[in-house]
Amino acid sequence: MLGRSGYRALPLGDFDRFQQSSFGFLGSQKGCLSPEPGSVGPGADAPESWPSCLCHGLVSVLGFLLLLLTFPISGWFALKIVPTYERMIVFRLGRIRNPQGPGMVLLLPFIDSFQRVDLRTRAFNVPPCKLASKDGAVLSVGADVQFRIWDPVLSVMAVKDLNTATRMTAHNAMTKALLRRPLQEIQMEKLKIGDQLLLEINDVTRAWGLEVDRVELAVEAVLQPPQDSLTVPSLDSTLQQLALHLLGGSMNSAVGRVPSPGPDTLEMINEVEPPASLAGAGAEPSPKQPVAEGLLTALQPFLSEALVSQVGACYQFNVILPSGTQSIYFLDLTTGQGRVGHGEPDGIPDVVVEMAEADLQALLSKELRPLGAYMSGRLKVKGDLAVVMKLEAVLKALK
């Protein structure tokens, strides 16, 4: 039937190209009673009646004549240059036309209004928020999202604030995905979860003319461990033995049914001497020693001249113990190979850090990052925040 009538079917893949065909300054090539190109969708305008089409044409002709009469002056305002990475969406008497550009675009004065749309890949971040995983852990997690606009008309017509709507969609999808997973799966399969979030977000944003290219999860900190997790296995291998010989029997009673350490570990515990900073405190057993003092003293073997040249700052740690008292320690990375000890530093510290003993333990075991601790309120800073961020170099030295 189509062959006899002289018409041919337009392939479905060419429909978008057909919508973006060239226009004259008076309107569409299709006719007054047909909808404007780009007006396909739930918010499309109805076809114009012949009186409306006639008025539209007369006003457009008058606008074009006014442009010609005042062209030397009006040319500066009517001619717009659109770069390759942009498209211009033009509204003529309230009706949308097809995307204009790249190149030079002519606008009719007092009739046309326009909006530029950037087609380049852009990125935004989902601010870190507190979420509860499936196993009861509380963590601070955010995301980095890269996106681009593939349909300029939909990006203008479908949603008012595209960036805010996309950010909220990504936040909701991330929340729903992480609530169904335990903490270990979130930490081990961030790339897989990011790919799933990519598909879920695109299912929503494609109708807005936007396509998400990449989603990367960023776990800032674990604010509360899982309810059924053990304390010792979650520590870094270097600090695990340190915690065992510092806490002794109290650590074993805290973890419940954890098997007792082997003979080699017991022999090592018996040979370890108390830290020098506690020599004058009497013959107290090691389980009563402050955990913070032992953890900070354990940093001494990892200090080096290279670390001093990289950091070059002096820190004072005001550690709040579980009893409510406050202990002061220092980490001097300004001269020599660096020093760490109990009490205030010899000079004025570059920054004063205040945190709880448990948070310090999580920081040195690499469960908590300085930036995540600061954003969650678990680390208070008096001084330059950039100096505190240099603690990342100290944490990297712990192997």
Swiss-Prot record:
<feature type="transmembrane region" description="Helical; Signal-anchor for type III membrane protein">
    <location>
        <begin position="58"/>
        <end position="78"/>
    </location>
</feature>
<dbReference type="Pfam" id="PF02036">
    <property type="entry name" value="SCP2"/>
</dbReference>
<dbReference type="InterPro" id="IPR036527">
    <property type="entry name" value="SCP2_sterol-bd_dom_sf"/>
</dbReference>
<dbReference type="GO" id="GO:1990830">
    <property type="term" value="P:cellular response to leukemia inhibitory factor"/>
</dbReference>
<feature type="topological domain" description="Cytoplasmic">
    <location>
        <begin position="79"/>
        <end position="399"/>
    </location>
</feature>
<keyword id="KW-0735">Signal-anchor</keyword>
<dbReference type="GO" id="GO:0031410">
    <property type="term" value="C:cytoplasmic vesicle"/>
</dbReference>
<dbReference type="InterPro" id="IPR043202">
    <property type="entry name" value="Band-7_stomatin-like"/>
</dbReference>
<dbReference type="GO" id="GO:0045121">
    <property type="term" value="C:membrane raft"/>
</dbReference>
<keyword id="KW-1003">Cell membrane</keyword>
<keyword id="KW-0968">Cytoplasmic vesicle</keyword>
<keyword id="KW-0967">Endosome</keyword>
<keyword id="KW-0472">Membrane</keyword>
<keyword id="KW-0812">Transmembrane</keyword>
<comment type="similarity">
    <text>Belongs to the band 7/mec-2 family.</text>
</comment>
<comment type="function">
    <text>May play a role in cholesterol transfer to late endosomes. May play a role in modulating membrane acid-sensing ion channels. Can specifically inhibit proton-gated current of ASIC1 isoform 1. Can increase inactivation speed of ASIC3. May be involved in regulation of proton sensing in dorsal root ganglions.</text>
</comment>
<dbReference type="GO" id="GO:0005886">
    <property type="term" value="C:plasma membrane"/>
</dbReference>
<dbReference type="InterPro" id="IPR001107">
    <property type="entry name" value="Band_7"/>
</dbReference>
<protein>
    <recommendedName>
        <fullName>Stomatin-like protein 1</fullName>
    </recommendedName>
</protein>
<feature type="domain" description="SCP2">
    <location>
        <begin position="288"/>
        <end position="399"/>
    </location>
</feature>
<comment type="subunit">
    <text>Interacts with STOM; may redistribute STOM from the plasma membrane to late endosomes.</text>
</comment>
<keyword id="KW-0813">Transport</keyword>
<dbReference type="InterPro" id="IPR003033">
    <property type="entry name" value="SCP2_sterol-bd_dom"/>
</dbReference>
<dbReference type="GO" id="GO:0008200">
    <property type="term" value="F:ion channel inhibitor activity"/>
</dbReference>
<dbReference type="InterPro" id="IPR001972">
    <property type="entry name" value="Stomatin_HflK_fam"/>
</dbReference>
<keyword id="KW-0597">Phosphoprotein</keyword>
<dbReference type="InterPro" id="IPR036013">
    <property type="entry name" value="Band_7/SPFH_dom_sf"/>
</dbReference>
<dbReference type="Pfam" id="PF01145">
    <property type="entry name" value="Band_7"/>
</dbReference>
<keyword id="KW-1133">Transmembrane helix</keyword>
<keyword id="KW-0445">Lipid transport</keyword>
<feature type="short sequence motif" description="Tyrosine-type lysosomal sorting signal">
    <location>
        <begin position="6"/>
        <end position="10"/>
    </location>
</feature>
<feature type="modified residue" description="Phosphoserine">
    <location>
        <position position="28"/>
    </location>
</feature>
<dbReference type="GO" id="GO:0031902">
    <property type="term" value="C:late endosome membrane"/>
</dbReference>
<dbReference type="GO" id="GO:0006869">
    <property type="term" value="P:lipid transport"/>
</dbReference>
